[in-house]
Design a protein with these regions (language model features):
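Short active-site oxyanion
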Residues: 1, 95, 99-105
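Short loop/turn motifs at secondary-structure junctions and domain boundaries
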Residues: 35-40
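Conserved beta-strand in the GNAT
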Residues: 46, 52-62, 68-76
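Conserved active-site alpha-helix within GNAT-family acetyltransferase domains
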Residues: 100-104, 110-134
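Conserved acetyl-CoA-binding loop-helix of GNAT-fold acetyltransferases
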Residues: 77, 83-96, 108
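Short alpha-helical functional segments enriched in proximate histidine and acidic residues
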Residues: 20, 97, 114
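Non-DNA-binding regulatory cores of transcription-related proteins
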Residues: 123-137, 144-149, 153-156
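Short amphipathic alpha-helix that is part of the acyltransferase structural core
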Residues: 1-30, 46-53, 144-156
Length: 156
């Protein structure tokens, strides 16, 4: 079962993150960018089996040149449930709930070979305040306007 994240889920999600990503997560640019921020729980989701959270997808508010967007991450699934489509379900359900009238784009730091199935692309016109390999910055425009996104990605 998938539902919106609640504030009370935070400790369980952080424990799942620790179990899935391990101590190496602290060195990842995506972790460093998000570490002092609170997720936007309106769009963040959790996947339950029984009363246990076995998957989570989080979104954080961001903007590029005053255009509102969301940064996706992390997308995590308990190791014992990998390969069962839970990550794909979390991606599809969470993205379908995003209001494209107020959210213009979604960005993430990740692997194009996985996220391209959700129409994410590399965007070489945007960057973070810290060093992130350009081919890892993935972008999905939500509005069909002729907006071109370029510049610094600011998280808040």
């Amino acid at each position: 079962m998938i539902r919106e994240e609640k504030k009370s889920d935070n400790k369980k999600i952080l424990l799942l993150e620790e179990n899935v990503l391990g101590p190496g997560r602290y060195a990842r640019p995506s972790f460093r960018l998000r570490e002092s921020l609170k997720p936007n729980i309106k769009y963040s989701k959790v996947y339950f089996k029984g009363n246990k959270i076995i998957g989570s997808i989080r979104y954080f508010n961001c903007r590029i040149n005053n255009q509102s967007g969301l940064m996706l991450g992390p997308l995590i699934v308990d190791q014992s449930f990998k390969g069962k489509g839970i990550g794909r379900e979390l991606m599809n359900q969470s993205m379908s709930s995003i209001n494209s009238n107020s959210i213009n784009f979604i960005i993430l730091i990740g692997e194009l070979n996985y996220y391209s199935q959700f129409n994410f692309e590399v965007n070489t016109n945007i960057y973070f305040a810290i060093n992130v390999r350009q081919e890892k910055i993935l972008f999905k425009k939500l509005l069909d306007k002729n907006n071109t996104f370029f510049g610094k990605i600011e998280l808040y």
